[in-house]
């Protein structure tokens, strides 16, 4: 499909695209990028921009280095830089009559289904009003425990929530190479990836840019989420003028094709949870039942790992600790420890109150 047939497109911009190594804002680049957005809008495509740069812009304003910033200070710097960042977008986009809005998200906003659905409605309403949402992680309130840490994975969740057809990750590299192209001259660009296997993960290398926190590993993680959400993803070099136009004309990039055409919206959200709260280790019989589309019952659970509450995302592991599924638990970890290994009819007696018979209902579990 690539971009031609995409109705909703999410575009992620890295900090290194907005600010160069000398801490100068790339205004000319942003103007050319805005022309790409204008062209997409003319094609009746809905666009969301996920932009890094709040902390980088804050550091520029304060004339300090981003390196070794502690999280409390980085939150203050982000607060300063966020205004600078949005002013930059506003000044540039208004010249092309592109209306923009701002959305700040945290990890919890995409992990909790109610918040995720609220975000979806907000995106839909902004599209109807003719606005281009500009999204960033809310660095001013996010802590290390509830933080994405990079905008690649945030962009993949935004793509998932908004129902996007394509996610474009613009970076300082052309895509995924067989080796690090900055070191090996014989490195070859991988044009298309259908399956992210161990070999693909192995060759993912870290970015060495001054302002970016991502690197190829986080882009691979983002691709996994997209592939399981029916969304295609592309990694492309954004340092060129008109980067979106370059993708369509030259295709010098790496495309990750979706594994599925469509997943139930609820299961999309379950499968790509960034931070499962715990895990259940199950026996072979329970694993086979899951493969047959059945619910997970207490009788097949051998061990509980971690502390979690009813409704939390959890992993399901087989006896070899291999992740075979993810789901939403109908019980807390304390409750499961009391009922595991027992028949469903015994649950009321063991807990002292009436509850569900399934630890994870079949509608709330997805095999991985």
From Swiss-Prot:
It is found in: Cytoplasm. SUPFAM superfamilies: Carbamate kinase-like, PUA domain-like. Pathway: Amino-acid biosynthesis; L-proline biosynthesis; L-glutamate 5-semialdehyde from L-glutamate: step 1/2. Its main location: cytoplasm. GO terms for biological process: L-proline biosynthetic process. PROSITE patterns: GLUTAMATE_5_KINASE (PS00902), PUA (PS50890). One of its GO terms (molecular function) is RNA binding. InterPro entries: AceGlu_kinase-like_sf (IPR036393), Asp/Glu/Uridylate_kinase (IPR001048), G5K_ProB (IPR041739), Glu/AcGlu_kinase (IPR001057), Glu_5kinase (IPR011529), Glu_5kinase/COase_Synthase (IPR005715), Glutamate_5-kinase_CS (IPR019797), PUA (IPR002478). It comes from the Bacteria. It holds the Pfam family PUA. Residues 277-354 form the PUA domain. Keywords: Amino-acid biosynthesis, ATP-binding, Cytoplasm, Kinase, Nucleotide-binding, Proline biosynthesis, Transferase. SMART domains: PUA. ATP binds at residues 12, 171-172, 213-219. Its EC number is 2.7.2.11. Gene3D superfamilies: Acetylglutamate kinase-like (3.40.1160.10), PUA domain (2.30.130.10). Catalyzes the transfer of a phosphate group to glutamate to form L-glutamate 5-phosphate. HAMAP family: ProB. Belongs to the glutamate 5-kinase family. This is Glutamate 5-kinase. It comes from Pelagibacter ubique (strain HTCC1062). The lineage of its organism: Bacteria, Pseudomonadati, Pseudomonadota, Alphaproteobacteria, Candidatus Pelagibacterales. The gene is proB.
């Amino acid at each position: 499909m690539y971009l031609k047939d995409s109705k909703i497109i999410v575009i992620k911009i890295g900090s290194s695209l907005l600010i160069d190594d000398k801490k100068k804002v790339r205004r000319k680049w942003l103007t050319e990028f805005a022309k790409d957005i204008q062209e997409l809008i003319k094609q009746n495509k809905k666009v969301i921009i996920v932009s890094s740069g709040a902390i980088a812009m804050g550091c520029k304003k304060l004339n300090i280095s981003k390196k070794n910033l502690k999280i409390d200070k980085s939150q203050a710097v982000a607060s300063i830089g966020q205004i600078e960042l949005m002013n930059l977008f506003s000044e540039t986009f208004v010249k092309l009559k592109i209306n923009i809005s701002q959305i700040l998200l945290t990890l919890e906003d995409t992990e909790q289904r109610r918040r995720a659905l609220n975000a979806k409605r907000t995106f839909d309403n902004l599209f109807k009003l003719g606005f281009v949402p500009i999204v960033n992680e809310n660095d001013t309130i996010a802590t290390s425990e509830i933080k994405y840490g990079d905008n690649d994975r945030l962009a993949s969740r935004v793509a998932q929530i908004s129902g996007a057809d394509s996610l474009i990750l613009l970076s300082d590299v052309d895509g995924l190479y067989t080796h690090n192209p900055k070191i090996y001259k014989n490195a070859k660009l991988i044009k298309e990836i259908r399956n992210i296997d161990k070999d693909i993960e192995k060759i993912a290398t870290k970015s060495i840019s001054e302002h970016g926190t991502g690197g190829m590993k986080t882009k691979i993680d983002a691709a996994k989420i997209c592939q399981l959400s029916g969304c295609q993803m592309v990694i492309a070099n954004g340092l060129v003028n008109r980067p979106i136009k370059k993708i369509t004309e030259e295709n010098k990039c790496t495309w990750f094709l979706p594994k599925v055409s469509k997943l139930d919206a609820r299961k999309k959200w379950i499968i790509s949870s960034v931070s499962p709260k715990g895990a259940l280790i199950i026996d072979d019989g329970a694993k086979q039942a899951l493969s047959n589309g059945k619910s997970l019952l207490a009788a097949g659970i051998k061990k509980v790992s971690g502390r979690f509450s009813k409704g939390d995302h959890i992993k399901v592991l087989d006896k070899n600790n291999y992740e075979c599924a993810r789901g939403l638990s109908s019980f807390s970890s304390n409750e499961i420890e009391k009922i595991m290994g027992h028949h469903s009819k015994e649950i009321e007696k063991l807990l002292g109150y009436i509850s569900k018979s399934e630890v994870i209902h079949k509608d709330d579990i997805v095999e991985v």
